[in-house]
Amino acid sequence: MSRIQFENVSKHYAGKTVVAVDNLNLGIEAGEFLTLLGPSGSGKTTSLMMLAGFERPSAGTIRFDGVPIETLPAHRRNMGVVFQSHALFPHLTVAENVAFPLKVRRLSRSETATRVTSALEKVRLAPFAERMPHQLSGGQQQRVALARALVFEPRLVLLDEPLSALDKKLREEMQLEIRRLHRELGVTMAFVTHDQSEAMVMSDRVAVFNHGRIEQIGPPQQLYDAPCNTFVAGFLGDNNKVEGKSGPDPVAPAGQMEIRLANGLTLRGRRAGHSTNGPSQVLCVRPECLKVALDAGQLETGNQIGARLVDIIQQGDHWRLVAALSDEDGGLRAENWTVKVNVGSVPAGLTVGQPVVLRFRPEDAWIF
């Protein structure tokens, strides 16, 4: 049995026509790190707040180790919660902030002191015990919030976009810090974010939310390599897509299909498990799966599509090429494509405005 189980859980607010969470069924296993990923308004934070006890479901059941908890007050759920805002008491020292949950639980002074020291050591802030919150950096303040969430040894820790206010360097440091704590303590963690790179780095599993429902759930690499639809493909990582019409392809290998674009070009890719049955299809391919050349003769056989180079952007360890697909008749429905090329692999003589050929293997593309 899962540690946490959402069973047909829904949440709607009075006066609003949009359902915040729509018939959610989700299990969180003991000891796992599950990320709820999605855009603003997708239902991920509302789901976490219902689990924490700050919101009550409109329908359905939430179980913690088999026991229904949807009517249980938040302070009786024994869950640690870390918020984006840190929510530290400005008039208390670091140690006093961490000790607060223990004072509420009426632990002895000696037990409180022992646990506070241990929690601060876990987050590597023991030397800062007597400092005030305003004397700490943003990353240090978030470590204090983590220590406070862990000090009473909860069975579950909930993290609501705790790193979104930090700069890139601090955010990456805290990602590794939280991963380390999860690995060392083995505590179950549920993490909310809209940052797909955060989800990829930190999670055992990712649940991708959209319009109050889970589109897909699984290990991050599985979702990246085999998205179930165009939303997941576009939200979890960069993605190029183009629309076309499906058609018979008697020579396509098993599991592949062919689409014909508005400009008459045919492309082949893997048939997605949730591929639509209608005539209109969407082909998706990742930027790192594309190769670029000045003419078709420089590329291996496979899917090839003409384009015009719009921009060349250097991004540290790689180049990002932006290309507009060739569309003489104006009927092609596609945004500009991007190509990720390692430094040193950009074809010589490549300039903005130049016609190029893009190539990708059928097994690297999905057709939905």
Regions found by a protein language model. Give the residues of each.
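Helix-to-loop junction immediately C-terminal to a conserved catalytic motif
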Residues: A52
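Conserved ABC transporter NBD signature motif
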Residues: G60-P68
